[in-house]
C-alpha cells in the first residue's frame, strides 16, 4: 500500500533486462531513445554512446520494420566494440514480425497493445463478438511472442499510449484512463498465463492528468490481482525547454513522490542525451526523502486523493478559491520590482510583507501563513473565526508533498473551507533545478484537485523567471492557460524531418497565440491521438511531407516540408484563430 504521508518505493518484481535488472530493490533506472535512423548504423552507435556517457542505463531504438530490427544487431556490435555493454531496447508499432526479429538482437522489446494485433471491426459481428474475437487474437499472437521471449531470455515492455488505443478498447471504454488500463491488463493476463515475469509496463500520455490517473489506476488493479510488475514512467510529447521540463516533472515527479516508478524517461524535443541529466536531477531530488519518517496525521485512511477539494473552498475577494482559477502570488520581499507585463502575477507579496493586487493593498483579506507545526486546534479555531481568510500553507521539510497533504488533511477533517495557497522556499541557484523541484512538488498536489494557488520563493533567481514557472506549473496541470501549449514529440528514427528546428520555427511564429494548443509530431504512430485535444496539428507524413490537422481532422495532406509552417499559419488564419502581435 502506498504511503501518502511519506516516501517509500512500491514493491515490484524484478525484470531481468540483460545485465541491468529492473524493479525490486534495484536502483530506479534512467533511459532515453535515439532519434536517428536505425538503418544508419554509425549514427546510431555514436548517438547511443553519447546517451550512455550521459548516464543512461538503457537505450531504445525504433524498429518500424524487419530490416530495422535486423540492423539492431550491428548497432549492438558497434557499441560493444567501443566498450559499451548496456541493454538495448527495440520500439515496435504495427509489426509483430519486426518484434519477433528484434527479440533475436536486443535485450528488451517494447510493443504497443494498441497496434500489436490489428483487428478492424467489420462484417456482421456484434460489438461483443468483435471484442471477444480480438481478445482471442491477442491471446494467440501475443502468447506466441511471450513464449519466444521466454526461450531467448528477453524482456518485454507493454507500452500503452493514450494516443494509440486499439479500436476495440476505444469502442468499449472510450479515450480514457480506464481504456488504457484495460488495454494493459489484457496483455498482462497473457504474460501471467505463460508464467512470464520479465515484463515492464508503461502508461503514457501527453496530458499529465490522464497519465498519472492511468498509472495510479493500473497500480490499484495490479495490486488487486496480486501483480507487482515494474513500471516505466514518462510524459510523452512533453515538448522542449522550460515547458518540457515542467510537464515531465509534474507527471513523473508526482508518481515518484509516491514511490511509483522503476525506470523513467524525460521525453524532450531535444537531443536525447540532454534528457539524461534532467532525469537524474529529478530522481535525485525525490530520493532525498528516502529514510525520512512519514508525517504523523490523524485518520490517514480518510485522505481521498480523488475527490476534488479545490472547488469546495469558499471564494475570497471574488477571485480566490471556489470555482475561480488558481492564482499566482509573486514573493517580492527581497525588493525585486521587475515584471513581465504580458504575464503579471495575480498578487504580489511586497517588500513590506503585505499583499497587493494591481498596486492596491488587499486590506480586506487576511493571508495566514501556516506551517505543519503551527496547525494546532487553537490555530484552526482562530482561522474559522476570521472571515475572508486565505491560508498560505508553507512547506519547510524534506518531503513537501507529504507535508502539504498532512496539512490539507488536517484542515479538511476540521471542516475548514478557506482557500489554500501552496508555498515553499527553494534555495536553488540554477533555474532548471527550480523548474524540476517546484513542478514535482506542487504538481503532485494540484493534480489531486487541491490548492487554490501557488507561491514559489526563490531569492537566488530572477523573480520574473520564478513567476513564469508558477504559471507553467498551472498550465502543465491543465488548470490555467497562460501561453501557447505545444504538444511535441521527442522524435525518433521514424521522424523524417528535423523536429527540433521545426518546433523552434513554429514557436517563433505562434508563441503569441496564448489560447491555442498546437501538436508537432514526428509521425502518425501517436501523433493524431496524443494531440487529440490540440487546436491544430503538424504531423510528419513521409519523406519531406507534412499533414496538417484542425483538431482531430486532417485537412491538408502531403504538404512539402518547406511550405508547411507557412501553411499552418494560413490554416490558423482561415479559422479565425490568428492574432497579430
From Swiss-Prot:
It holds the Pfam family GcpE. One of its GO terms (biological process) is terpenoid biosynthetic process. [4Fe-4S] cluster binds at residues 489, 492, 523, 530. Disulfide bonds: none annotated. Keywords: 4Fe-4S, Iron, Iron-sulfur, Isoprene biosynthesis, Metal-binding, Oxidoreductase. Its EC number is 1.17.7.3. Pathway: Isoprenoid biosynthesis; isopentenyl diphosphate biosynthesis via DXP pathway; isopentenyl diphosphate from 1-deoxy-D-xylulose 5-phosphate: step 5/6. One of its GO terms (molecular function) is 4-hydroxy-3-methylbut-2-enyl-diphosphate synthase activity (flavodoxin). The keyword Iron applies. Its cofactor is [4Fe-4S] cluster. The keyword Coiled coil does not apply. InterPro entries: Dihydropteroate_synth-like_sf, IspG_atypical, IspG_bac-typ, NO2/SO3_Rdtase_4Fe4S_sf. It is an enzyme of class 1 (oxidoreductase). Signal peptide: none annotated. PANTHER family: 4-HYDROXY-3-METHYLBUT-2-EN-1-YL DIPHOSPHATE SYNTHASE, 4-HYDROXY-3-METHYLBUT-2-EN-1-YL DIPHOSPHATE SYNTHASE (FERREDOXIN), CHLOROPLASTIC. Converts 2C-methyl-D-erythritol 2,4-cyclodiphosphate (ME-2,4cPP) into 1-hydroxy-2-methyl-2-(E)-butenyl 4-diphosphate. Belongs to the IspG family. This is 4-hydroxy-3-methylbut-2-en-1-yl diphosphate synthase (flavodoxin). It comes from Porphyromonas gingivalis (strain ATCC BAA-308 / W83). The gene is ispG.
Amino acid at each position: 500500500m502506498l504511503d501518502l504521508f511519506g516516501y517509500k518505493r512500491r514493491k515490484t518484481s524484478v525484470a531481468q533486462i540483460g545485465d541491468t535488472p529492473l524493479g525490486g530493490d534495484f536502483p530506479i533506472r534512467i533511459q532515453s531513445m535515439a532519434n536517428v535512423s536505425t538503418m544508419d548504423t554509425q549514427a546510431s552507435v555514436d548517438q547511443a554512446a553519447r546517451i550512455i556517457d550521459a548516464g543512461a542505463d538503457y537505450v531504445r531504438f525504433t524498429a518500424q520494420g524487419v530490416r530495422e530490427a535486423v540492423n539492431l544487431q550491428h548497432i549492438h556490435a558497434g557499441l560493444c566494440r567501443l566498450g559499451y555493454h548496456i541493454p538495448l531496447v527495440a520500439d515496435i508499432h504495427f509489426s509483430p514480425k519486426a518484434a519477433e526479429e528484434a527479440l533475436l538482437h536486443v535485450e528488451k522489446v517494447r510493443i504497443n497493445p494498441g497496434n500489436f494485433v490489428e483487428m478492424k471491426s467489420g462484417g456482421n459481428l456484434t460489438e461483443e463478438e468483435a471484442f471477444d474475437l480480438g481478445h482471442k487474437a491477442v491471446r494467440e499472437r501475443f502468447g506466441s511472442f511471450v513464449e519466444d521471449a521466454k526461450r531467448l531470455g528477453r524482456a518485454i515492455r507493454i507500452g500503452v499510449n493514450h494516443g494509440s488505443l486499439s479500436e476495440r478498447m476505444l469502442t468499449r471504454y472510450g479515450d480514457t484512463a480506464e481504456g488504457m488500463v484495460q488495454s494493459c491488463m489484457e496483455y498482462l493476463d497473457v504474460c501471467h498465463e505463460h508464467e512470464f515475469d520479465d515484463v515492464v509496463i508503461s502508461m503514457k500520455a501527453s496530458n499529465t492528468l490522464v497519465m498519472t490517473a492511468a498509472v495510479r489506476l493500473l497500480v490499484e488493479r495490479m495490486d488487486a490481482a496480486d501483480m507487482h510488475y515494474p513500471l516505466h514512467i514518462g510524459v510523452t510529447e512533453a515538448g522542449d525547454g522550460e515547458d518540457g521540463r515542467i510537464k515531465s516533472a509534474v507527471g513523473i515527479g508526482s508518481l515518484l513522490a509516491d514511490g511509483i516508478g522503476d525506470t523513467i524517461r524525460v521525453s524532450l524535443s531535444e537531443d536525447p542525451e540532454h534528457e539524461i541529466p534532467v532525469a537524474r536531477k529529478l530522481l535525485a531530488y525525490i530520493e532525498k526523502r528516502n529514510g525520512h519518517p512519514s508525517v504523523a496525521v490523524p485518520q490517514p485512511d480518510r485522505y481521498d486523493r480523488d475527490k476534488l477539494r479545490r472547488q469546495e473552498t469558499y471564494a475570497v475577494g471574488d477571485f480566490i478559491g471556489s470555482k475561480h482559477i488558481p492564482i499566482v502570488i509573486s514573493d517580492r520581499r527581497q525588493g525585486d520590482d521587475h515584471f513581465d507585463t504580458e504575464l503579471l502575477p495575480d498578487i504580489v507579496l511586497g517588500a513590506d510583507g503585505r499583499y497587493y493586487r494591481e498596486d492596491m493593498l488587499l486590506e480586506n483579506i487576511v493571508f495566514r501563513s501556516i506551517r505543519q507545526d503551527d496547525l494546532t486546534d487553537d490555530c484552526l479555531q482562530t482561522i474559522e473565526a476570521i472571515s475572508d481568510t486565505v491560508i498560505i500553507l508553507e512547506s519547510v521539510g524534506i518531503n513537501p508533498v507529504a507535508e502539504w497533504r498532512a496539512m490539507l488533511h488536517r484542515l479538511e477533517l476540521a471542516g475548514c473551507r478557506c482557500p489554500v495557497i501552496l508555498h515553499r522556499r527553494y534555495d536553488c541557484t540554477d533555474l532548471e533545478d527550480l523548474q524540476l523541484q517546484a513542478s514535482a512538488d506542487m504538481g503532485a498536489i494540484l493534480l489531486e484537485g487541491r490548492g487554490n494557488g501557488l507561491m514559489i520563493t526563490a531569492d537566488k533567481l530572477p523573480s520574473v523567471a520564478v513567476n513564469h514557472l508558477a504559471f507553467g506549473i498551472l498550465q502543465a496541470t491543465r488548470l490555467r492557460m497562460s501561453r501557447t501549449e505545444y504538444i511535441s514529440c521527442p522524435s525518433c528514427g521514424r521522424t523524417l524531418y528535423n523536429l527540433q528546428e521545426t518546433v523552434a520555427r513554429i514557436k517563433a511564429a505562434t508563441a503569441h497565440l496564448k489560447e491555442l494548443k498546437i501538436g508537432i509530431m514526428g509521425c502518425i504512430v501517436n501523433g493524431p491521438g496524443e494531440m487529440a485535444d490540440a487546436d491544430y496539428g503538424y504531423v510528419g507524413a513521409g519523406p519531406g511531407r507534412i499533414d496538417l490537422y484542425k483538431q482531430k481532422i486532417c485537412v491538408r495532406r502531403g504538404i512539402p516540408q518547406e511550405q508547411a509552417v507557412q501553411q499552418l499559419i494560413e490554416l490558423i488564419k482561415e479559422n479565425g484563430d490568428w492574432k497579430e502581435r
